[in-house]
């Protein structure tokens, strides 16, 4: 019997690397997808390639998008500064419709691969407040996926799996370490340099550092 397949969104960060390890532990044959979408730096794409190689995924695909042509986010528009202090409401690092776009392309690849499970590393506990990281979004996208695809209407339902949804960052770190994830390969910083070193000041850096500290595990992050 063929091993079950899964498509996994892999950003190169801590969360998505953990999800790959979780899927592999569940017996999935893993296909990872990253996006060159006009983000501020290429460090996370380099990290995604390292993680995919280190974890031995079946195939790692990088899709080119031009979300910086739309702008509207500090991650895609160089005229908007990345904040270095917590903010109220949805932060300027939110990229309009990003997870909707990413999941749509992952859905297309999953249908081609005859995979029925798509994993995403969104989290609604220790997170930045993005609307497309909430459980309601994941559930709604799954319903849409099964209405919008040939496989879905033929009864071969897709599942959108978000195993980190209700975990704290410390719990995520502990789970990943238990599964052998090498977090030194990952990059979480919104404004990392070309060598993958982190600023230590942005929201993503803060959440990552707090997660390792709360987990009681040494943080392998390099800073500039």
Curated annotation (Swiss-Prot):
Superkingdom of this protein's organism: Bacteria
Binding site residues for ATP: 10-20
Residues that coordinate or bind Zn(2+): 189, 199, 202, 205
Entry note: cofactor: Binds 1 zinc ion per subunit.
Disulfides per UniProt: none
Coiled coil: none
Cofactor: Zn(2+)
Pathway: Purine metabolism; 7-cyano-7-deazaguanine biosynthesis
Class in the EC hierarchy, top level: ligase
Enzyme Commission number, as recorded: 6.3.4.20
Gene Ontology MF terms in the entry: ATP binding; ligase activity, forming carbon-nitrogen bonds; zinc ion binding
Membrane-spanning residues: none
Record-level GO BP terms: queuosine biosynthetic process
Catalytic reaction annotation: 7-carboxy-7-deazaguanine + NH4(+) + ATP = 7-cyano-7-deazaguanine + ADP + phosphate + H2O + H(+)
InterPro entries assigned to the protein according to its UniProt record, in alphabetical order: QueC, Rossmann-like_a/b/a_fold
Keywords, in A-Z order: ATP-binding, Ligase, Metal-binding, Nucleotide-binding, Queuosine biosynthesis, Zinc
One Pfam family recorded for the sequence: QueC
HAMAP family associated with the record: QueC
Family: Belongs to the QueC family.
Biological role stated in the UniProt entry: Catalyzes the ATP-dependent conversion of 7-carboxy-7-deazaguanine (CDG) to 7-cyano-7-deazaguanine (preQ(0)).
Protein name: 7-cyano-7-deazaguanine synthase
């Amino acid at each position: 019997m063929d091993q079950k397949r899964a498509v996994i969104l892999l950003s190169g960060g801590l969360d998505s690397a953990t999800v790959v390890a979780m899927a592999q532990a569940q017996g999935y044959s893993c296909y990872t997808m990253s996006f060159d979408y006009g983000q501020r730096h290429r460090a996370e794409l380099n990290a995604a390639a390292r993680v995919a190689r280190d974890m031995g995924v079946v195939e790692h695909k990088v899709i080119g998008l031009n979300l910086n042509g739309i702008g509207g986010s500090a991650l895609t528009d160089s005229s908007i500064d990345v904040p270095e202090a917590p903010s109220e409401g949805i932060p300027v690092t939110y990229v309009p419709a990003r997870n909707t776009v990413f999941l749509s392309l992952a859905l297309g690849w999953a249908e081609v691969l005859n995979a029925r499970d798509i994993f995403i590393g969104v989290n609604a506990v220790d997170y930045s407040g993005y609307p497309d990281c909430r459980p309601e979004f994941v559930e709604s996208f799954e319903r849409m996926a099964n209405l919008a695809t040939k496989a879905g209407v033929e009864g071969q339902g897709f599942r959108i799996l978000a195993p980190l949804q209700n975990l704290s960052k410390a719990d995520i770190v502990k789970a990943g370490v238990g599964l052998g994830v090498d977090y030194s390969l990952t990059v979480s910083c919104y404004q990392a340099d070309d060598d993958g070193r982190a600023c230590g000041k942005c929201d993503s850096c803060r959440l990552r550092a707090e997660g390792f500290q709360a987990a009681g595990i040494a943080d392998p992050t390099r800073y500039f």
